[in-house]
């Protein structure tokens, strides 16, 4: 029997897996930039690209054009087929469906917070606290990733597999569509401050076993997030319209952004 030598990309893929385990990278976390990761592993960028493509095809990683490469959440088959793929199709047809998903999160996350307050173990609480502390990072990319992990840690603490898989499906679909807006929230000091206070209120209620308080705190938080992200999108659309206007308005906008 002839044993074919392993391809270099397969070896690099194994090293990426080992790195994920070594660094305790969790689902939803972003891998280092391609150049940095290639240097870290001591391989060429071409070999790394092939390895990453292999891991994406195996469902280990999730690649977003212009957004980077993320550790992918493990979806049950029913979740992938009935939640993730249909939502991806909707989002591809019309990105504005992201706001419909955000509205659906009200019902889902109100429940996860309620159940987490009733069922969270000491280990669950420790993970929620660590994710919250990571949202305080001065790097908006790290903070926004930690924000996702914070919400999923609460879903895990609900110990309800249907709620958890639904949440994972939502965040998988929303990963790229709201990434920029989520980062912007962490770049605006007053918004960042309110997010921190809201997250702390959710934690306090969950840790105190106050189910109704946790539900209300989560709904207030999501209402703020929805309103803020919608305002960001409207501001961006307004700016785009202004820059297309002829004459004084356009000149004024250019001077303002110069």
Swiss-Prot record:
Molecular function via GO: cis-regulatory region sequence-specific DNA binding; DNA-binding transcription activator activity; DNA-binding transcription repressor activity
Single Gene Ontology BP term?
DNA damage response
Q: What UniProt keywords are attached to this protein's entry?
A: DNA-binding, Transcription, Transcription regulation
InterPro entries attached to this UniProt entry: GntR_C (IPR011711), TF_FadR/GntR_C (IPR008920), Tscrpt_reg_HTH_GntR (IPR000524), WH-like_DNA-bd_sf (IPR036388), WH_DNA-bd_sf (IPR036390)
Instruction: Name the DNA-binding segment ranges.
Output: 34-53
Q: Where is the HTH gntR-type domain?
A: 6-74
Induction (free text): By L-lactate; aerobically.
Q: Which Pfam families match?
A: FCD, GntR
**Record flagged with keyword DNA-binding:** yes
Query: Which PROSITE patterns does the record match to this protein?
Result: HTH_GNTR
What PANTHER family would the database entry show? L-LACTATE DEHYDROGENASE OPERON REGULATORY PROTEIN-RELATED, TRANSCRIPTIONAL REGULATOR, GNTR FAMILY
- Which function does this protein serve? May be a regulatory protein for the LCT genes.
What's this protein's name? Answer: Putative L-lactate dehydrogenase operon regulatory protein
Q: Which organism is it from?
A: Escherichia coli (strain K12)
